[in-house]
Regions:
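Short structural boundary motif marking the start of a folded domain
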Residues: 1-2
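Extracytoplasmic
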Residues: 10-80
Length: 80
């Protein structure tokens, strides 16, 4: 499954709050995407990655990330 990652946070609540802000700021770009917060443990640090998708192909995900980056928002294509 192809998704984009929009940030990583120390608290799940911060990831969810970030989605609300990003969705408001980039309504047209994120309108058809579903958020997902994924918990990961890196060394002894727990992080929560804010991801959105799914995308049917990597080209669409790359295009959206380029648009997000042009608007000074973080974006990384994952799952390809």
């Amino acid at each position: 499954m192809i998704r984009i990652q929009l940030g990583a946070y120390q608290h799940r609540e911060d990831a969810l709050a970030s989605w609300t802000i990003l969705k408001r700021r980039h309504t047209a770009l994120l309108a058809d995407l579903q958020p997902e917060v994924r918990q990961v443990d890196i060394d002894e640090t727990r992080m929560y990655r804010l991801q959105a998708g799914p995308f049917s192909n990597v080209d669409d995900a790359n295009l959206l990330c380029r648009r997000m980056l042009a608007r000074e928002s973080e974006c990384l294509v994952i799952g390809h």
